[in-house]
Amino acid sequence: MSRRYDSRTTIFSPEGRLYQVEYAMEAIGHAGTCLGILANDGVLLAAERRNIHKLLDEVFFSEKIYKLNEDMACSVAGITSDANVLTNELRLIAQRYLLQYQEPIPCEQLVTALCDIKQAYTQFGGKRPFGVSLLYIGWDKHYGFQLYQSDPSGNYGGWKATCIGNNSAAAVSMLKQDYKEGEMTLKSALALAVKVLNKTMDVSKLSAEKVEIATLTRENGKTVIRVLKQKEVEQLIKKHEEEEAKAEREKKEKEQREKDK
């Protein structure tokens, strides 16, 4: 039935669905995992790197995380070439606002501006939607630290913790379980991000070259966006593995004690 309605983006099916937009969302479901966590003292993005090759130039170190302006960064899941077009557009919107009003663009306004463009591509014939979902982290004077997510339909929302890409449903349920509202520090958020990626990524063992992590904090009245170095990511993974081993030992000891009873 759907074949008659999915060749053009602008045609609704009898059930009121836009199949092309749904297919674009499907493309994101096969992309590398990206997650964002909001903490009291900052906000972070963690992403899975699929394109790891020892001959790749380290100059282009960041594959999934893009800096947009002094106060915002984003992470992408989906078709990378589409993502490049959208991140360039985001940077332009931010620069135009800065030029016009002499102050940085509020986070939500930047997200809304891009979502308007994404939405337009679901409405005009002869175009296809962008096959990209984005996670945005940022700080502005109105609402402090913020985390947003947008999808190919032009929909967006503010989140405390969320995930896009492969195995996102499992990751979101883990975040829901372990996210402590009002108590999250950046340190505990980093540990949680590594824990979630370790469980949801399709690899037998988590390694530093497969993960990209960026943090956004405030220091001396300025926003600082940092992409963690490989050594730092290695330390986080090592710490997580030690904690896992410790928890496993304690569990076995407890089971043994119960048996002895």
From Swiss-Prot:
Keywords from UniProt, A to Z, are: Acetylation, Cytoplasm, Nucleus, Phosphoprotein, Proteasome
Q: Which SUPFAM superfamilies match?
A: N-terminal nucleophile aminohydrolases (Ntn hydrolases)
Q: Where in the cell is it found?
A: Cytoplasm; Nucleus
User: What PROSITE patterns would the database entry show?
Assistant: PROTEASOME_ALPHA_1 (PS00388), PROTEASOME_ALPHA_2 (PS51475)
Q: Where N6-acetyllysine occurs along the chain?
A: 127, 176
Which Pfam families does the UniProt record give? Answer: Proteasome, Proteasome_A_N
UniProt region (Disordered), positions on chain: 240-261
Q: What is its main location?
A: cytoplasm
Note whether Plastid occurs among the keywords. no
Residues annotated with Phosphoserine modification: 13, 75, 173
Describe the function of this protein: Component of the 20S core proteasome complex involved in the proteolytic degradation of most intracellular proteins. This complex plays numerous essential roles within the cell by associating with different regulatory particles. Associated with two 19S regulatory particles, forms the 26S proteasome and thus participates in the ATP-dependent degradation of ubiquitinated proteins.
Give the matching NCBIfam families.
PRK03996.1 (NF003075)
How does it associate, per the subunit comment? The 26S proteasome consists of a 20S proteasome core and two 19S regulatory subunits. The 20S proteasome core is a barrel-shaped complex made of 28 subunits that are arranged in four stacked rings. The two outer rings are each formed by seven alpha subunits, and the two inner rings are formed by seven beta subunits. The proteolytic activity is exerted by three beta-subunits PSMB5, PSMB6 and PSMB7.
Q: What is this protein called in UniProt?
A: Proteasome subunit alpha type-4
- This chain's source organism reads Rattus norvegicus (Rat)
